[in-house]
Amino acid sequence: METVNVNLGKRSYPIYAGPGILQDLGELLGGLPVGRKVLLISNPTVFSLYGEKAAESLARAGFTVAVAEIGDGEEHKTLATAGRLYDRAFEAGLDRRSSIVALGGGVVGDVAGFVAATYMRGISFVQVPTTLLAQVDSSVGGKVAVNHPRGKNIIGAFYQPRLVLADVDTLKTLPVRQMRSGLAEVIKYGVIWSREFFAWLEQNIEALLNGEAGALAYAVRESCRIKAQVVEQDETEQGLRAVLNYGHTVGHAVEALTHYRVYTHGEAVGIGMAVEAGLAVALGMLKRSEGGRIIRLIRQAGLPEGLPEGLPPEKTVEKFYHDKKAVEGQLTFVLPERIGRAVVKNGLAKNFLLEFLSAGYGLLERGAGRV
């Protein structure tokens, strides 16, 4: 078991990563000054696979465990779902010293974290992510939220977990599509932060797709290490942390315009990273050769790289204005300057973006990856 620490003063916490560590959940939580009541939140699929092991580990450590299940998918990430979880927390007798444990992917973690942040003004929260995307991204950094009909993650908070436990053995049961989806966020870290990690991914993408435990453990640990470094410097996204949104301005627009029914989050981010790499090339910020490497790796991961056919540029750009990063009508994109470094770009003109998208995003050839 490897440990990555997120150093945030009184809100610091460890990320434990490795194979076969779910059985240690109770012992690790028991080492913290928390009460003995726990609400374990999961979805039916994950709970059927790992719920009993997690609950038994908590019970062995002296915790009284109540269970709540929520549906899987973005359509369940709502205030209505949160309301049902508040009811379950009251029924289970949770008080201000109790804990909520999220066992599942990003939706479970986001909703459970939002409930933990707001129940009795905040109780202890533990992330036990079981998808690659959640292990490398959504479980780390304290972003918790539910969706609103007008936008994704509009209702939320920054609320750090007490610990994160990422057992890479849970990835063995992950469908191939979800594994590829998680790789989008892994690739993101290489593009925005570490040229060396990006090069490692180019050499090891097949091993990751084949589920090789050693490669997965390294990718999870390195991704968490990079995200921890960013979060430590900018916990509440006032500046630097915005680079973690590379691929997400376009990605969120794609998700919304396809009603969250066509693409997984990671697939949408893959499209976003490809389009935004093309945008960086069109602006003269990124070398065409570097853009080509980014597109090739996205394709090798089995992720989509082009906007959906028939998606009107006008509607796409309009969705950009609903993005949380847009401030006072100014659009904000995170664009790579080179592999290993990304910057925040503000104030791109609407007409330029319309031209860019209408032309098949400029210097980026749709579906070809030649930039």
UniProtKB/Swiss-Prot annotation:
It catalyses: 7-phospho-2-dehydro-3-deoxy-D-arabino-heptonate = 3-dehydroquinate + phosphate. It is an enzyme of class 4 (lyase). Binds 1 divalent metal cation per subunit. Can use either Co(2+) or Zn(2+). It is found in: Cytoplasm. Its EC number is 4.2.3.4. One of its GO terms (cellular component) is cytoplasm. NAD(+) binds at residues 72-77, 106-110, 130-131, 143, 152, 170-173. SUPFAM superfamilies: Dehydroquinate synthase-like. Its cofactor is Co(2+); Zn(2+); NAD(+). One of its GO terms (molecular function) is 3-dehydroquinate synthase activity. Zn(2+) binds at E185, H248, H265. Keywords: Amino-acid biosynthesis, Aromatic amino acid biosynthesis, Cobalt, Cytoplasm, Lyase, Metal-binding, NAD, Nucleotide-binding, Zinc. Disulfide bonds: none annotated. Catalyzes the conversion of 3-deoxy-D-arabino-heptulosonate 7-phosphate (DAHP) to dehydroquinate (DHQ). This is 3-dehydroquinate synthase. It comes from Pelotomaculum thermopropionicum (strain DSM 13744 / JCM 10971 / SI). The lineage of its organism: Bacteria, Bacillati, Bacillota, Clostridia, Eubacteriales.
